Amino acid sequence: MNQERVFKVLLGPHVSEKATVLADSKKQFVFKVATDATKLEIKKAVESLFDVKVAAVNTLNVQGKTKRTARGLGKRNDWKKAYIALQPGQDLDFSGSAE
């Protein structure tokens, strides 16, 4: 997988209360990913970007909410979320600080 596709697959971490609990307790991390990304692409992107070993990838499609606007009803975009489980002894560091 080329470097350009790696950055297009992973859109960023998804920060929520549930994601924080999973990261602390089970070493599972949640990312927003491209809607056309496959589990294998997501696994390779995380492994190459963060230098960790991925044990499992679970994905789900999140439906966009319907919202009221001044002109009637509108709909937010659908998006895809990936739960990344790391192998034992691995950890992700989002701060990017070199020690």
UniProtKB/Swiss-Prot annotation:
List all disulphide bridges recorded for this chain.
none
Keyword Thylakoid tagged: no
Pfam families, alphabetized:
Ribosomal_L23
Q: Name one GO molecular function term.
A: structural constituent of ribosome
Q: Which UniProt keywords apply?
A: Ribonucleoprotein, Ribosomal protein, RNA-binding, rRNA-binding
Is Cytoplasm given among the entry's keywords? no
A GO cellular component entry from the record = ribosome
Give me the segments passing through the membrane. none
| One example of a Gene Ontology biological process annotation | translation
Complex formation: Part of the 50S ribosomal subunit. Contacts protein L29, and trigger factor when it is bound to the ribosome.
What is this protein's function per UniProt? One of the early assembly proteins it binds 23S rRNA. One of the proteins that surrounds the polypeptide exit tunnel on the outside of the ribosome. Forms the main docking site for trigger factor binding to the ribosome.
What PANTHER family would the database entry show? Answer: 60S RIBOSOMAL PROTEIN L23A
The entry assigns this protein to a family as follows:
Belongs to the universal ribosomal protein uL23 family.
What is the protein named? Large ribosomal subunit protein uL23
Organism annotation: Stutzerimonas stutzeri (strain A1501) (Pseudomonas stutzeri)
List the gene name.
rplW
